[in-house]
From Swiss-Prot:
Name the UniProt record assigns to this protein: Gag-Pol polyprotein
Segments of this protein annotated with the region Interaction with host PIAS4: 345-393
Sequence motif: PTAP/PSAP motif, positions: 111-114
Pro residues: compositionally biased ranges: 110-124, 161-173
Residues anchoring lipid (N-myristoyl glycine): G2
Domain Reverse transcriptase: 741-932
Native species: Friend murine leukemia virus (isolate FB29)
Zinc fingers (CCHC-type) by residue: 502-519
Binding-site residues for Mg(2+) 1, renumbered to this chain: D809, D883, D884
Length: 1738
């Protein structure tokens, strides 16, 4: 077999985790797919020798890196992270790369002089892209060599390799040189420079191997400078005997600094030095930082390219070191290079490295502190010696010290006041007091001896106790022997006869032993029971019987725990960690002392008496888990002591079964395991392999076309980011995602839709399943009518004659239906799996779960596919509920044949059933939560136990859970609605949860009813139904039955609460409502079959002739349409029902006539009549009037006789006519108290309320049918109360607005006229804001201050002694304080402006004169916080001056503008405008990104106009992007960002945007073309040739002449290109341009020199800042903020990072004072990023 070849690319892919870790350490991110693409496709095209399989050759990697880092359009910024990571792997190879990396070649050539023999070459592979399989170099890292100075002739370091060096011997003990070399003698003359360069190898080297003795530039004897290049030995020694720049930049910077100061290197030497000591990336960073340090003429860093290139060139300059100018350039260059080294050496902050510095076991605190400070200097920008950082260093010193020292330092008193020196001294004391190793060994030895001594003493004591016990037992034995001898002597010899080996000692019979003797009273001893879940004995151990202690084994959290029954323990105890603990704790007192322990959280425990919630005490040091009295009480346990030991049983004597488990796993307790009676054997699985999910795989409905999901017309794609997901959850759902990908159900995609994935943990396991949150998608998809069958009545189609059943559950049913490719993008979600190379979106190709229409779509598809099966098998009943199938047959054979046909059909159609859940050909099956057996449906025991086991609810949510679970079983509970009536009010939101006796009784009744739930027959649609109905206290109860022989078999128990209106009717009418409600519910089960209603009332006559005084027309019509349908509903004879069963009693009940009962029903007052009383004391007429007058509704009520008004009153505005009628009638009844009264009213509402409806309202609690409070509740209650005041009463209804001369007509007209007049004439007694009616103060309350008196004196007011107040203009004067309180209160009510409030006060009469009203009102309105935050403000800021360039191409403004329609993908226009000339450049783009901006800037603007100095833009994402700003920094461009939400700041380019778009619009209208890109040159031509503010066009400013309108090419143009006249023309153009440019620049500068102060805001002022995007009911202004810095047009405020234009702020107090004499001073601080502002007088 062949062996796979390992390549660098495959090696990195095999160790991809390490590659990602390396990239992460470099602060970059790499992707596997792009890694392969760049290595195999991109980098081989660079023509530097990069193979397609990759290489670790550093030279080739460097060449590729140079290509990638190339500036301009030829660079590849997207490949930077990948080549940097590849280089890091090659430079610092991990273990799996080292065998494949070339060792560095030795810095030597073949020796030119005798020297040591060269080392044998390493067997390394040749430099190639393909490496041999396994070739590993030596693992030992050679120590750096210190080479002597070269003695040979000088060589060219740039073209030749360095000379050979002999291998130095081991260093001398003092480290000053090699062992075989002698230092030079003292007094020797210094050699000349030439001698030092040409000395032989026999001369000893210098002591410092890192310092060269030949300086590159030195002064010779003739005054000329001589150049001496660096020797290769110096470069080698510097590189190998110093750390790299990345490891310790400070040390290498110090070395280079000394070399620069002492050697005076040239430009070439500096490049050689940097290239030797630094890597390529480090060198680039140093050069970049050095160029940033170049300063301009003003002493500040400059960004001008020419100044930077002059001071720090990147190419070799022509600096002559023999001239002073050249030497000055070199000195300046070295200074800049040193600054670049220092700036580049500032490594990024890495506090993790600092935290990793910990004190060693034997390290002193002082040494540890030095290491800590060094880490701060190396890995952070902070100086540990800075007093401001002393606190951080001190805390790190405490936390990272040795554990014993750190704990003691933390406990020091007044730790905050301790300095770092104090902490070090304390740490030194603790360190010095540590015990020495000898002392520690002595202490351990002493403790060991003491422990051994105690153990020996305990052994001796134990031995003595054992001997004492043995003597005591021996004494008892001897006493027994002596007693037996005495009895033998007294009674003779009584020896027991000898027994055979199989003889019983009790009955003396052979064949059994005594313990199995059947003649013993307790019978033979049975086999010992084995305890599985519960055991009363321990399992014992190693052949020994466990102690007879009562024990019970409980299963806690899935693990069995054996408890010791301890009646002395008050609480039950767990010893192992049970999971989360609560915050509660308890003090436990034991034999050895007391200690505090914590409680566990509540655990739900299922006991023999039901499920309870219990909390255990967690005591880890308890020797055994204890079952205390608290849980024994809940168990109702009984402990019996017998001869074999103690036994613990329940209250009924049964063994206890105790189990602790999670609530979500509770249902599994009650489900019976699948019995082995009908297993799915190999026959069913082998005969139909395509029908089972276990053998057929994932299903696919072959007859169903792919589904297209229609969207709503206004729907737009929704994209929601993936929620954060834990690592455990991601790993949990990863296998499911992988499985679905392998099956093709999930596929990668790119979609504008995205919804998050939610991992849901499966209960009781550590497995997760992926669930997609499709709620937002569901909102945007068209709704379809759900056709899924109702499980409530689905079984109505199953006749009782079919009693053989098969139940099938389809596996992954929704995944059987395909999605159309156009709809697959709707269900995309994010998923990243680096190991599989997946990073993007996945979507479903099948119908997903969680989609709202999935059940309906699948249900309809499966119905269509199974239609043929139903036609071919008419004798079988097939019920389908989504993916649950029930097949019913009359015989076992038919059921088996039908099941086979169904399985064959499902397999052919592509559906798969679950073999684990299948129930095939059984007479008893579970379907939809019901137990089907013998034509009846039962509640399953599991469902009963679930309801019975729930603890007493303590919250509304728990109660809703209980009612929901029990409500599913309501068909089996007679009168469920009445039972649960006390519970439902507690489930309402906002209701106080109070669990009382009534609720507990209802709770227990529902549970008890479930235990006795009967079997319900399946509805037989071939037989009629009978509905027995009863009603009690507003609750309808009934039972739906069918005849089964002579008996009535219940089909369902129905119950429901009547609405509040029907609940207030008489009993006979309530029965009508009850029958109507239950008939509607029964119709869901009868499916339109005939229904006979049996009730104890003759309701048929009531329905046919309903009393109109009780029922509304709408309700009457509804009842008649429902109950008088004779084809479906019939009424049976009147029967008396048993209240328990709701079935008829054998004896007949008392008969009554419902019509007679209703006729006798009366209202509130029995003697109330509607006929006039002949002997009445008074006859009155009442009326209420409500009408609109001048836009206001006025109302009044009156009580009159025929000729005079008895009582009349105006009612509050807005009162309705019905309410006014009730008030008038109630007032008449009150005035006639104790008298006989006839009262007439023309209001049907008031008449019906008094006679009929009032009592009905009172009975039903004054609620409407919806349960809401009725209108005019207070007036109705007052009327019902006033009905009993007169002695005798008659309320008579008369028509309103009658004509004629009858008494009723005259009285009614009189009452109506009086009500209208009083409503018009009088003002209702309501609270108003008029001062004269509700003045808060009187004259006596006024208190005038001294300031008030002065102001009053100036006004000329006089003091009135009688009124005791000041008077002005005939009105009492209100003091200033009272005026402020009144006006402030008025402003808080209205928040009107100053002018409108003043106008309001002047228009309304005021009895007082308000002192200083206008001034006070102005202060109140201007200082109101709410008004300041909401009211708009006029901008008083003057227009600023725009900064322009001083020549063309130096200052540009840039902006994006959107142009619609976007043809060919071009939707945006990138506009450049030169602020000096107005020249415009515009480029159509497809995207609005920073990449587009930088590309156009470098490819279009820079080559044609030169590098700009200033760029001005708004704060768009493309301009504030890091890419744009980085490019600007590299190019030295000053990028100015304008104020946010201030388009005037970019006014020139914004105006040009408008001009271009207007021109394009006109051109498209004129030409008829929609291609604006084609018309753009014409628009630019117009913009460039339009005169500006100075009368010149941008073309004329730039080119010095107008553009040629017509230009025909001349064929002889080439002949005159070198004509002298052409040169003269160019010179003239130059002169014209300067003549034009200079005045323009002067005009622009004149605008800037004008002293303008646009805004009055100063540092320290308080301002409000405008919100540019306000939400609903959000203030328009935010703040106030304090001004920190100002410019002529913008402000910097505290709390907002960006600058704010002055037009976007307003003063918090508009009364801005003029500038004072104080001035602000700016001072520098130690931090270069901070300034200090001080204020003082000038």
């Amino acid at each position: 077999m062949g062996q796979a070849v390992t390549t660098p690319l495959s090696l990195t892919l095999d160790h991809w985790k390490d590659v990602e870790r390396t990239a992460h350490n470099l602060s970059v991110e790499v992707r596997k797919r792009r890694w392969v693409t760049f290595c195999s496709a991109e980098w081989p095209t660079f023509n530097v020798g990069w193979p397609r399989d990759g290489t670790f050759n550093p030279d080739i990697i460097t060449q590729v890196k140079i290509k990638v880092f190339s500036p301009g359009p030829h660079g590849h910024p997207d490949q930077v992270p990948y080549i940097v990571t590849w280089e890091a792997i090659a430079v610092d190879p991990p273990p799996w790369v080292r065998p494949f990396v070339h060792p560095k070649p030795p810095l030597s050539l073949p020796p030119s002089a005798p020297s040591l023999p060269p080392e044998p070459p390493l067997s390394t592979p040749p430099q190639s892209s393909l490496y041999p399989a396994l070739t590993s170099p030596l693992n030992t890292k050679p120590r750096p060599q210190v080479l002597p100075d070269s003695g040979g002739p000088l060589i060219d370091l740039l073209t030749e390799d360095p000379p050979p060096y002999r291998d130095p011997g081991p260093p001398s003990p003092d480290g000053n040189g090699d062992s075989g070399e002698v230092a030079p003698t003292e007094g020797a003359p210094d050699p000349s420079p030439m001698v030092s360069r040409l000395r032989g190898r026999k001369e000893p080297p210098v002591a410092d191997s890192t310092t060269s003795q030949a300086f590159p530039l030195r002064l010779g004897g003739n005054g000329q400078y001589q150049y001496w290049p660096f020797s290769s030995s110096d470069l080698y020694n510097w590189k190998n005997n110093n750390p790299s720049f990345s490891e310790d930049p400070a040390k290498l910077t110090a070395l280079i600094e000394s070399v620069l100061l002492t050697h005076q290197p040239t430009w070439d030497d500096c490049q050689q030095l940097l290239g030797t000591l630094l890597t390529g990336e480090e060198k680039q960073r140093v050069l970049l930082e050095a160029r940033k340090a170049v300063r301009g003429e003003d002493g500040r860093p400059t960004q001008l390219p020419n100044d930077i290139n002059d001071a720090f060139p990147l190419e070799r300059p022509d600096w002559d070191y023999n001239t002073q100018r050249g030497r000055n350039h070199l000195v300046h260059y070295r200074q800049l290079l040193l600054a670049g080294l220092q700036n580049a050496g500032r490594s990024p902050t890495n506090l993790a490295k600092v935290k990793g510095i910990t004190q060693g076991p034997n390290e002193s605190p002082s040494a540890f502190l030095e290491r800590l400070k060094e880490a701060y200097r190396r890995y952070t920008p902070y100086d540990p010696e800075d007093p401001g950082q002393e606190t951080n260093v001190a805390m790190s010193f405490i936390w990272q010290s040795a554990p014993d020292i750190g704990r003691k330092l933390e406990r020091l008193e007044d730790l905050k006041s301790k300095t770092l020196g104090d902490l070090v001294r304390e740490a030194e004391k603790i360190f010095n007091k540590r015990e020495t190793p000898e002392e520690r060994e002595e202490r351990i030895r002493r403790e060991t001896e003491e422990k051994e001594e105690r153990r020996r003493a305990e052994d001796v004591q134990r031995e003595k106790e054992r001997d004492r016990r043995r003597h005591r037992e021996m004494s008892k034995l001897l006493a027994t022997v002596v007693s037996g001898q005495r009895q033998d002597r007294q009674g003779g010899e009584r020896r027991r006869p000898q027994l055979d080996h199989d003889q019983c000692a009790y009955c003396k019979e052979k064949g059994h032993w005594a313990r199995d003797c059947p003649k013993k009273p307790r019978g033979p001893r049975g086999p010992r029971p084995q305890a599985s879940l519960l055991t009363l004995d321990d399992q014992g151990g190693q052949g020994q019987e466990p102690p007879p202690e009562p024990r019970i084994t409980l299963r806690v959290g899935g693990q069995p725990v054996t408890f010791l029954v301890d009646t002395g323990a008050q609480h039950s105890v767990l010893t192992q960690n049970p999971g989360p603990l609560s915050d509660k704790s308890a003090w436990v007192q034991g034999a050895t002392g007391g200690k505090r322990y914590r409680w566990t959280t509540d655990r739900r425990v299922h006991l023999a008496t039901g499920k309870v919630t219990h909390s255990f005490l967690h005591v880890p040091d308890c020797p055994y888990p204890l079952l205390g009295r608290d849980l024994l009480t809940k168990l109702k346990a009984q402990i019996h002591f017998e001869g074999s030991g103690a036994q613990v049983v329940g209250p009924m004597g049964q063994p206890l079964q105790v189990l602790t488990l999670n609530i979500e796993d509770e249902y599994r307790l009650h489900e019976t395991s699948k019995g082995p009676d009908v297993p799915l054997g190999s026959t069913w699985l082998s005969d139909f392999p395509q029908a089972w999910a276990e053998t057929g795989g994932m299903g696919l409905a072959v007859r169903q076309a792919p589904l297209i999901i229609p969207l709503k017309a206004t729907s737009t794609p929704v994209s929601i980011k993936q929620y954060p997901m834990s690592q455990e959850a991601r790993l949990g759902i990863k296998p499911h995602i992988q499985r679905l990908l392998d099956q093709g159900i999930l596929v990668p995609c790119q979609s504008p839709w995205n919804t998050p994935l939610l991992p849901v943990k499966k209960p009781g396991t550590n497995d997760y399943r992926p669930v997609q949150d499709l709620r937002e998608v569901n909102k945007r998809v068209e709704d379809i009518h759900p056709t899924v069958p109702n499980p409530y009545n689905l079984l109505s189609g199953l006749p009782p004659s079919h009693q053989w059943y098969t139940v099938l559950d389809l596996k992954d049913a929704f995944f059987c239906l395909r999605l159309h490719p156009t709809s697959q993008s709707l269900f995309a979600f994010e998923w990243r799996d680096p190991e599989m190379g997946i990073s993007g979106q996945l979507t479903w190709t099948r119908l997903p779960q969680g989609f709202k229409n999935s059940p309906t779509l699948f249900d309809e598809a499966l119905h269509r596919d199974l239609a043929d099966f139903r036609i071919q098998h008419p004798d079988l009943i097939l019920l389908q509920y989504v993916d649950d199938l029930l097949l019913a047959a009359t015989s076992e054979l038919d059921c088996q044949q039908g099941t086979r046909a169904l399985l064959q059909t499902l397999g052919d159609l592509g559906y798969r059933a679950s073999a684990k859940k299948a129930q095939i050909c059984q007479k008893q099956v579970k379907y939809l939560g019901y137990l089907l057996k013998e034509g009846q449906r039962w509640l399953t025991e599991a469902r009963k136990e679930t309801v019975m086991g729930q603890p007493t609810p303590k919250t509304p949510r728990q109660l809703r859970e209980f009612l929901g679970t029990a409500g599913f079983c309501r068909l089996w509970i007679p009168g469920f609605a009445e039972m649960a009536a006390p519970l439902y009010p507690l489930t309402k939101t906002g209701t106080l949860f109070e669990w009382g006796p009534d609720q507990q009784k209802a709770y227990q009744e529902i549970k008890q009813a479930l235990l006795t739930a009967p079997a319900l027959g399946l509805p037989d649609l071939t037989k009629p139904f009978e509905l027995f109905v009863d009603e009690k206290q507003g609750y309808a109860k009934g039972v739906l039955t069918q005849k089964l022989g002579p008996w009535r078999r219940p089909v369902a128990y129905l119950s429901k609460k009547l609405d509040p209106v029907a609940a207030g009717w008489p009993p006979c009418l309530r029965m009508v409502a009850a029958i109507a409600v239950l008939t509607k519910d029964a119709g869901k089960l009868t499916m339109g079959q005939p229904l006979v209603i049996l009730a104890p009332h003759a309701v048929e006559a009531l329905v046919k002739q309903p009393p109109d005084r009780w029922l509304s027309n709408a309700r009457m019509t509804h009842y008649q349409a429902l109950l008088l349908d004779t084809d479906r509903v019939q009424f049976g004879p009147i029967v008396a029902l048993n209240p328990a069963t709701l079935l008829p009693l054998p004896e007949e009940g008392l008969q009554h006539d419902c019509l007679d009962i209703l006729a006798e029903a009366h209202g509130t007052r029995p003697d109330l009549t509607d006929q006039p009383l002949p002997d009445a004391d008074h006859t009155w007429y009442t009326d209420g009037s409500s009408f609109l007058q001048e836009g206001q509704r006025k109302a009044g009520a009156a009580v009159t006789t025929e000729t005079e008004v008895v009582w009349a009153k105006a009612l509050p505005a807005g009162t309705s006519a019905q309410r006014a009628e009730l008030i008038a009638l109630t007032q008449a009844l009150k005035m006639a108290e104790g008298k006989k009264l006839n009262v007439y009213t023309d209001s049907r509402y008031a008449f019906a309320t008094a006679h009929i409806h009032g009592e009905i309202y009172r009975r039903r609690g004054l609620l409407t049918s919806e349960g809401k409070e009725i209108k005019n509740k207070d007036e109705i209650l007052a009327l019902l109360k006033a009905l009993f005041l007169p002695k005798r009463l008659s309320i008579i209804h008369c028509p309103g607005h009658q004509k004629g001369n009858r008494a009723e007509a005259r009285g009614n007209r009189m009452a109506d006229q009086a009500a209208r007049e009083v409503a018009t004439r009088e003002t209702p007694e309501t609270s108003t804001l008029l001062i004269e009616n509700s003045a808060p103060y009187t004259h006596e309350h006024f208190h005038y201050t001294v300031t008030d008196i002065k102001d009053l004196t100036k006004l000329g007011a006089t003091y009135d002694d009688a009124k005791k107040c000041w008077v002005y203009q005939g009105k009492p004067v209100m003091p200033d304080q009272f005026t402020f309180e009144l006006l402030d209160f008025l402003h808080q009510l209205t928040h009107l402006s100053f002018s409108k409030t003043k106008a309001l006060l002047e228009r309304n009469y005021c009895p007082y004169y308000m002192l200083n009203r206008d001034r006070t009102l102005k202060d109140i309105t201007e200082t109101c916080q709410a008004c300041a935050q909401v009211n708009a403000s006029k901008s008083a800021v003057k227009q600023g001056t725009r900064v322009r360039g001083h020549r063309p191409g130096t200052h540009w403004e840039i902006d994006f503008t959107e142009v619609k329609p976007g043809l060919y993908g071009y939707k945006y226009l990138l506009v450049f405008i030169d602020t000096f000339s107005g020249w415009v450049e515009a480029f159509p783009t497809k995207k609005e990104t920073a990449k587009v901006v930088t590309k156009k800037l470098l490819e279009e603007i820079f080559p044609r106009f030169g590098m700009p100095q200033v760029l001005g833009t708004d704060n768009g994402p493309a301009f504030v992007s890091k890419v744009s700003q980085t490019v600007a920094d590299l190019l030295g461009v000053d990028w100015k960002l304008h104020c946010a939400y201030r388009p005037q700041s970019s006014g020139q380019v914004e105006r040009m945007n408008r001009t271009i778009k207007e021109t394009l619009t006109k051109l498209t209208l004129a030409t008829g073309s929609r291609d604006w890109v084609l018309l753009l040159p014409l628009a630019l031509y117009r913009a460039r040739n339009t005169p500006g503010p100075h009368g010149l066009t941008p073309y004329e400013i730039l080119y010095g002449a107008p553009p040629p309108l017509v230009n025909f090419p001349d064929p002889d143009m080439a002949k005159v290109t070198h004509n002298p006249s052409l040169q003269a023309h160019l010179q003239a153009l130059y002169l014209v341009q300067h003549e034009v440019w200079r005045p323009l620049a002067a005009a622009y500068q004149e605008q800037l020199d004008r002293p303008v102060v646009p805004h009055p805001f100063r540092v320290g002022d308080t301002v409000w800042v405008r919100r540019h995007q306000t939400k609903n009911l959000e203030p328009r202004w935010k703040g106030p903020y304090t001004v920190l810095l100002t410019t002529p047009t913008a402000l910097k405020v505290d709390g907002i990072a960006a600058w704010i234009h002055a037009a976007h702020v307003k003063a918090a107090d508009t009364r801005i004072e003029p500038p004072s004499e104080s001035t602000w001073r700016v001072q520098r601080s130690q931090n270069p990023l901070k300034i200090r502002l001080t204020r003082g007088t000038s």
